[in-house]
């Protein structure tokens, strides 16, 4: 049980990192921070994020089978994950570098949703970081929690 609790705590910390990272990037854009500084920040966050992406990939199959008490379903039975509108996608790969869960990857020169069930249920933060064409699409409604 202790190992599961550690994994849950790690997931919570990664979610906090995701939100903080999004806020920092938005602030840097609003302040017109020099592109060299922004690129350096991107490199640092990638280094910090990389071990967690590997962890999620190792446990991907287990994640699909995890029971989400708050939704009353296994993850594989919850239809919440991104889709890419390739008519809008510029292959800028911002989603790949942004997502701490490693949902996206590049294959044959285009961005793909490689690990859809690694996506945090009801999270759509990557669609905010996406290029201005809104190429990342999520379900219209959030998944309701059980009472």
UniProtKB/Swiss-Prot annotation:
The disulfide bonds in this chain are none
Keyword set for this entry? 4Fe-4S, Electron transport, Iron, Iron-sulfur, Metal-binding, Repeat, Transport
The answer to whether the entry has keyword NAD is no
State the InterPro entries in the record.
4Fe4S_Fe-S-bd (IPR017896), 4Fe4S_Fe_S_CS (IPR017900), Fe-S_Ferredoxin (IPR050572)
Necessary cofactors: [4Fe-4S] cluster
Q: Which residues form the 4Fe-4S ferredoxin-type domain?
A: 80-109, 110-141
Task: Give the superkingdom in one word.
Answer: Archaea
Q: Which molecular function terms from Gene Ontology are attached?
A: 4 iron, 4 sulfur cluster binding; metal ion binding; oxidoreductase activity
What's the protein here called? Answer: Uncharacterized ferredoxin MJ0251
Record the organism. Answer: Methanocaldococcus jannaschii (strain ATCC 43067 / DSM 2661 / JAL-1 / JCM 10045 / NBRC 100440) (Methanococcus jannaschii)
């Amino acid at each position: 049980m202790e190992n599961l609790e550690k994994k849950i705590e790690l997931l919570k910390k990664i979610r906090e990192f995701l939100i903080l990272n999004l806020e920092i990037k938005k602030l840097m854009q609003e302040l017109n921070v020099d592109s060299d500084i922004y690129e350096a920040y991107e490199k640092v966050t990638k280094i910090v994020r990389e071990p967690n992406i590997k962890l999620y990939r190792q446990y991907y199959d287990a994640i699909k089978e995890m029971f989400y008490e708050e939704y009353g379903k296994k993850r594989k039975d919850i239809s919440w994950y991104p889709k890419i509108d390739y008519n809008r996608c510029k292959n800028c790969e911002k989603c790949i570098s942004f997502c701490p869960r490693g949902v996206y990857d590049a294959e044959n020169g285009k961005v793909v949703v490689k690990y859809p069930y690694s996506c945090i249920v009801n999270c759509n933060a990557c669609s905010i970081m996406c290029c201005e064409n809104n190429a990342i699409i999520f379900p219209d409604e959030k998944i309701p929690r059980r009472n």
